[in-house]
């Protein structure tokens, strides 16, 4: 049944793309995959296949990719979604970057025959049965990094139990937490360890780099700054009144870095406010007085958010007011600032943990957002205390990359850079 569905999905994807922009991007990208592989895969080096579903999962494997010795191995990086591929198709951390062909048997056989991986690294919960079965048949070493196994995953359901067999392809599971370890044991697997989330290693590295942006320093001046990162329309909806009021009294500086930066999305964001924020793309023509007097700056470009968070006194991380999924709270927390999020974060254990520690605050509506935001911006002691909790939390959870790298050295010492 699964193979029939996979074959149907392969055949219908181009048609579905006519009605959905992201599906269209994925369909067009997958049409180029075989060309990319034929041109760039080298037969002279052993191959490491790294697969991440999207941009968020890619960030989890970055610390591992940075340690791979590319003189001895060729790295083939694949993505399932456009958010990963379109943003990272020119990543310097891989030799080949492409979309992963759908998990149809014909695609799988062709992909494995072309790439011939000697090591496969999957991220978080990328479990494609046909690919995993093919890796086992070719004796390819396979690991999962930053893995998550929840109670309600399909492996535990009547319709998904058959997929458990494909997990036998993994030589080792590096898991984020103890609950994942226990859930995996219930499925009969013991070749696992709790290494933690590699994103903590990634986040801890951010404070060591130069994140200075002169324009942001001029914009903020000596006022406190709220950074709203990876926002969606559902996030902006609960803070719209607060933003409008702040523009009138100019108490704080606001930087909004929305998840979607297409011109139409930026226009929709600007139109939702009762005033005219300035945009990052317009700063070159902006005189210094306009920059200092503006209350809100919209980052209409990708790749700046982790630096922008370094200017925050308080951060709101988007995605959890709606159903898009909470974005990366670690990138904000590493700078030692408290974090506010929306109400739907059950699938993100890191948010629950930081909330329990007292560094993160969940709000369910506009009233709670306004109350929490005002309290944290006005109370210096509370803000410093909760921010310190965030910074300490990041520092005390690093080390996952080291454990993974040590394991990879047992496969081949030449695999890892000194």
Regions found by a protein language model. Give the residues of each.
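C-terminal alpha-helical cap of glycosyltransferases
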Residues: 397-418
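Charged active-site motifs of nucleotide-sugar-dependent glycosyltransferases
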Residues: 43-49, 217-226, 236, 251-253
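Short acidic active-site motifs
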Residues: 107, 131, 162, 265, ...
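Catalytic binding pocket for nucleotide-activated donors in carbohydrate/polymer assembly enzymes
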Residues: 170, 186-187, 305, 310-384, ...
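Short acidic alpha-helix that forms the nucleotide-activated donor recognition element
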Residues: 107-114, 286-294, 302-313, 334
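Donor-nucleotide binding loops and adjacent catalytic segments primarily
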Residues: 63, 67, 72-73, 78-80, ...
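Short hydrophobic/aromatic-enriched beta-strand-loop microsegments
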Residues: 95-101, 142-146, 191-197, 251-256, ...
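Active-site and donor-binding regions of nucleotide-sugar-utilizing enzymes
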Residues: 14, 18-209, 227, 231-233, ...
């Amino acid at each position: 049944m699964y193979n029939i569905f996979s074959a149907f999905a392969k055949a219908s994807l181009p048609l579905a793309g006519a009605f959905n922009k992201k599906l269209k991007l994925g369909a067009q990208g997958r049409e180029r995959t075989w060309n990319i592989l034929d041109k760039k895969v080298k037969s002279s080096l052993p191959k490491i296949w790294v697969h991440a579903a999207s941009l968020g999962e890619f960030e989890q494997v970055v610390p591992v990719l940075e340690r791979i010795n590319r003189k001895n191995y060729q790295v083939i990086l694949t993505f399932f979604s456009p958010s990963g591929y379109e943003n990272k198709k020119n990543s310097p951390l891989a030799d080949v970057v492409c979309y992963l062909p759908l998990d149809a048997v014909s695609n799988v056989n062709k992909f494995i025959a072309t790439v011939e991986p000697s090591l496969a690294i999957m991220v978080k919960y990328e479990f494609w049965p046909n690919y995993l079965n093919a890796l086992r048949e070719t004796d390819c070493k396979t690991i999962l990094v930053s893995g998550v196994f929840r109670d309600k995953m399909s492996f535990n359901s009547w319709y998904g139990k058959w997929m458990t067999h494909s997990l036998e392809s993994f030589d080792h599971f590096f898991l984020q937490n103890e609950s994942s370890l226990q859930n995996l044991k219930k499925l009969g697997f013991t070749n696992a360890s709790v290494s933690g989330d590699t994103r903590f290693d990634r986040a801890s590295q951010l404070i060591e780099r130069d994140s200075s942006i002169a324009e942001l320093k001029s914009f903020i001046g000596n006022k406190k700054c709220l950074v709203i990162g990876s926002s969606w329309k559902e996030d902006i909806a609960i803070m719209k009144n607060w933003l409008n009021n702040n523009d009138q009294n100019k108490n704080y500086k606001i930087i909004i870095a929305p998840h979607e930066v297409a011109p139409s999305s930026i226009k929709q964001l600007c139109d939702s406010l009762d005033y005219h924020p300035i945009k990052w793309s317009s700063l070159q023509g902006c005189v210094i007085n306009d920059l200092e007097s503006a209350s809100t700056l919209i980052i209409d470009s990708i790749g700046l958010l982790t630096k922008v968070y370094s200017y925050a006194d308080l951060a709101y991380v988007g995605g959890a007011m709606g159903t898009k999924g909470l974005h990366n709270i670690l990138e904000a927390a590493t700078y030692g600032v408290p974090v506010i999020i929306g109400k739907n974060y059950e699938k993100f254990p890191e948010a629950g943990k930081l909330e329990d520690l007292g560094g993160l605050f969940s709000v369910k509506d506009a009233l709670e957002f306004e109350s929490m935001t005002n309290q944290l911006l006005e109370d210096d002691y509370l803000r410093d205390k909760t921010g310190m909790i965030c910074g300490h939390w990041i520092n005390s959870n690093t080390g996952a990359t080291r454990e993974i790298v040590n394991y990879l050295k047992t496969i081949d010492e030449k695999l890892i850079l000194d």
